[in-house]
Amino acid sequence: MAMKKNGKLWKYLEIEKKPLKGLMGLEWVILVYTLITLIITLFCFTKLQHPDAMIWGRIRICAITIAMWLVYRLVPCRMMKFLRIFIQMSLLGWWYGDTYRINSLFPNFDHIIARWDQQLFGCQPAMLFSEHFTHPIVSEVLNIAYVSYFPIILVICAFYFFERYNQLERACFIIVASFFSFYLLFDLFPVTGPMYYYKAVGMTKIAHGIFPAIGDYFCTHDEMLPPPGWTDGLGYYLLVAIHEGEHPTGAFPSSHVGIAVICMILAWKSQNKTLFFSILPFALLIFFATVYIRAHYVIDVFAGLIVGIIFYLLWDKVAKKCNF
């Protein structure tokens, strides 16, 4: 049956009266980050692993960005704008893995972060948390909370698309700009997290408070500890599936925590209580889940919380100034 022009779905497909002529703010952020990291890649070409693949990857993403802009110019509707945003967000995983290639230029700093945790707490919470809380319910809840990270982002973006369309570009700009701000930190400050570092140096040394520097060890190693807790639940299997594409990178500060905080702020700013209180339990549990599964040190969580708020304030101010 043909779709009626006054139907609810038609407004997402009809041509916008004032379509965006240029690139969206989030696309400019991606292009700027692409340029910065391309310069690093070219200057350090002989020191990087597979630099040619890094360069071609950037060329492809630039081509995709321009192609989607052209398609939107031909069919400037709401759905096409959302598709532009969705495609860029679907590439975040590629960019995350790319930070591993770039930060291999620098020595690993896990020993510093692990030492900070030890000094603050007198132990390694990332080691003891899962050892003391082994009940299947605890394990399953925290595993599911951890993997709810990307669904939370999708829910926020979808809500703004369907219910706050005039604020969609601003909300997605803040999320994407914050992601790439985290990625820039990961590029320059390599921390892999307990599941990699503990595996590399051995649990015996960790238990005795010994945290040796391991230099460029992770340039040639990516072995990690298996997820702790109950091994026969849906959350565990989802976590294992996610870890299949993991890289020893991106632990400090925790982007999981930072982006979760940003999503909570965006949910609160939407003035929709149902949205906010729906994601609140998952977002809060992410704080604990990152330590439970040994993806992060506790210091990473605190840093992610603070940096997430800073990034929100920064990019929200930029969005308002640029009228996104």
Predicted segments — roles?
Residues 193-199, 251, 285-311:
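Interfacial helix-loop-helix junctions of multi-pass membrane proteins
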Residues 188-269:
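Membrane-interfacial catalytic/cofactor-binding modules of polytopic membrane enzymes
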Residues 156-160, 257-275, 306-315:
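Membrane-interfacial alpha-helical segments at the cytosolic side of multi-pass membrane proteins
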Residues 2-61, 79-153:
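N-terminal transmembrane-helix/juxtamembrane module of multi-pass inner/ER membrane proteins
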Residues 138-152, 247-268, 298, 302:
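Membrane-interface loop-to-helix entry segments
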Residues 82-86, 154-190, 195-209:
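Interfacial segments of alpha-helical transmembrane regions
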Residues 18-19, 48-53, 72-84, 160-171, ...:
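Membrane-interface helix-boundary motifs at transmembrane edges
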Residues 35-43, 91-98, 179-187, 283-292:
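Aromatic-anchored segments of alpha-helical transmembrane domains
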